A protein has these predicted regions:
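PIN-domain endoribonuclease scaffold, especially VapC-family toxins
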Residues: 37-92
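Residues that scaffold the ATP/ADP-binding catalytic core of kinase and kinase-like folds
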Residues: 23-24, 58, 67, 128, ...
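Short, well-structured N-terminal submotif of metal-dependent ribonuclease cores
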Residues: 1-47
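Active-site neighborhoods of divalent-metal-dependent phosphate/nucleic-acid chemistry enzymes
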Residues: 82-122
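Acidic, PIN/NYN-like endoribonuclease modules and their adjacent C-terminal/linker elements
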Residues: 2, 96, 110-116, 122-146
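Amphipathic coiled-coil/heptad-repeat helices and related helical stalk/stem segments
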Residues: 30-31, 73, 101-102
Length: 146
């Protein structure tokens, strides 16, 4: 199993914000299990400052349906930042995807040399294949890494 352009022998993936939010909403779904697998070192999460900021921003919205206390969310985000491959972004590919907010996810994937992007919006990432990146739903990706 390749890990992308910068092959470490392990799968490297970008986890979209919608998957992070799903993991915070429920501990019984594939999204939560993906973050548990990352914490165990089963694969490597690629992270950028903009994506980390989006995790923080979206998880703090009162209408998002998360019942975890803000301090716990901060600790979770801190842990993700601790275990992740931190990737600076030097080149912007915008606009490339139908939803401009998804561009930063693909840009991170390209810069970090990931093999996978995990998202609930698979149809919005059709151009990822041009960069050798596979788009997976959380359940598809979980099957791949376990």
């Amino acid at each position: 199993m390749g890990g992308g352009v910068y092959d470490t022998g392990m799968i490297r993936a970008v986890i979209d914000t919608n998957v992070f939010i799903a993991a915070l909403r429920s501990s019984s779904g594939a999204s939560f299990q993906i973050f548990m697998a990352a914490d165990r070192g089963d694969f490597e999460v690629a992270l950028s400052v903009p994506l980390l900021a989006e995790y923080d921003d979206v998880s703090a919205r009162p209408d998002i349906g998360i019942t975890i206390p803000p301090a716990s969310i901060d600790a979770i985000i801190g842990r993700i930042a601790q275990i992740a491959h931190k990737q600076p972004i030097y080149f912007l590919w915008r606009p490339i995807l139908p939803d401009p907010k998804d561009d930063m996810v693909l840009e991170l994937g390209i810069a970090a040399g990931v093999s996978h992007i995990v998202t609930f919006n698979c149809k919005d990432f059709t151009q990822a294949a041009e960069f050798g990146i596979t788009i997976n739903s959380p359940s598809e990706f979980l099957t791949l890494i376990l």
